[in-house]
């Protein structure tokens, strides 16, 4: 027997069957010994298939009682497996006449058991995919709602519905929401809001890191990838793969000298046997994917642009309930609007909506942390009480000193006053804390009930959906409303995330003072001339002209798609032309370092123009 053709589980089963035959003093191992070994494992495919095909555990027990023979050596059947697996072993076993007779005698139909094994074998194939990935459709109910992006999702659906080259690749800057488009597709598949060819499809997010991990020998990575691709092919169009950072497929496992994944993917992608969604950034796509023309032409590009500030505000409003439920806080709408505006203005190294969402998330986490920490007023009083108790303990030892006795009396009186002041505050704090904790618990319960309601509606379980929608959920909603109404009187604890919390987080990220962030844009523009005069002395006409031009542009009186202002400062050396430009940059962009200064006196020579446009081809620094 060639052990290399059997997976480890089968080897264990065969060894166990052999031991069982030896314990019964039988001269050979027959299919019946193998049957006893398989059915004795309550988690095995054989046991589960018999219980499903028959009368549950009763049928399995009947089979155990009838089987008392030994095992017959099996050969691999043509089921497309590279190795003999447990499912193949069971199907081969069912074809044996002895086992068939035993099952019939036990009241179980062999054909029905075989069909159940085939069904379970399909689950095993899907489990192989899940080893290196995650089914996004299964998790769709727990994912964040996808607001907007309908055009991109529709484009992805259209590409997936093609006959060949049905592989969309999402291209966009980091943080614009490429993965969210795929999550939106998963939610549509779950709801059934997709064409027939995508109904019931599994959307598997493949992790190349998990596939590469532990591949110490050459060929191990390719073997894993081939098993995944074979599982997708056997699913016959019911599985769509998604790989984030698709450019990794062009370099996965190259360091060990192995073939990169793209060479294994190309044939199936071209024939349409594999439906595949990729995602990568513009820079990575240009650097890695475009260089491999054969790989690139098998994909259809779907560009994901950065959303505008109004679109970001809509996205934040859609995510509001999720973050409120997770953190147990309430988010004001003004905080969401300010988050989008401040992140666009001050956080320049990242993209919307990612930076705005992170801003809201951190603000919520900060407020939640403050809720879990004792208020400063109570903490200060408790420290004073502890300090006085220590002093009393020390003074009580000095009974002969009259001054100590007088001080002891004074300290005791002060301690009683502090305790009288601390007790009502502690009671109020505990009451407010209890209300907040109960509100958190009810909101979490509401989220769980909403997920259960969506599941009941998908399964068309009308009675259960009605009980949840008009019973349990409404009761929880009314309880939450009642608690939130009573929480409005909270003085010591606040669970509200407001604009001041957003401004505080932006200040921590950027170093810009909170007072400047809180300043209204309208007030800043009106006082622009005065602020410029604080730095530029004199030059009234120039300052007035600059301030008026900026004000006209910002209020919308200027031409659209034009700069806020274009100024030509003329005058002799030293009168303040550069200083006015620096002051203007400081007022508009909060730092004079954000001014790009080109000193044209440095460009007198012909060759110095290379400083602006770069070196010509063939010269150093050309790229």
Curated annotation (Swiss-Prot):
Region annotation I: where it falls in the sequence: 129-375
Entries under PANTHER family matching the protein: ATP-DEPENDENT CLP PROTEASE (PTHR11638), HEAT SHOCK PROTEIN 104 (PTHR11638:SF18)
Keyword ATP-binding found: yes
Upper taxonomic lineage: Eukaryota, Viridiplantae, Streptophyta, Embryophyta, Tracheophyta
Alphabetically ordered keywords of this record: ATP-binding, Coiled coil, Nucleotide-binding, Repeat
Segments forming domain Clp R: 1-123
InterPro entries the UniProt entry points to: AAA+_ATPase, ATPase_AAA_core, Clp_N_dom_sf, Clp_R_dom, ClpA/B, ClpA/ClpB_AAA_lid, ClpA_ClpB, P-loop_NTPase
Region (Repeat 1): 6-71
Family: Belongs to the ClpA/ClpB family.
Entry protein name: Putative chaperone protein ClpB2, chloroplastic
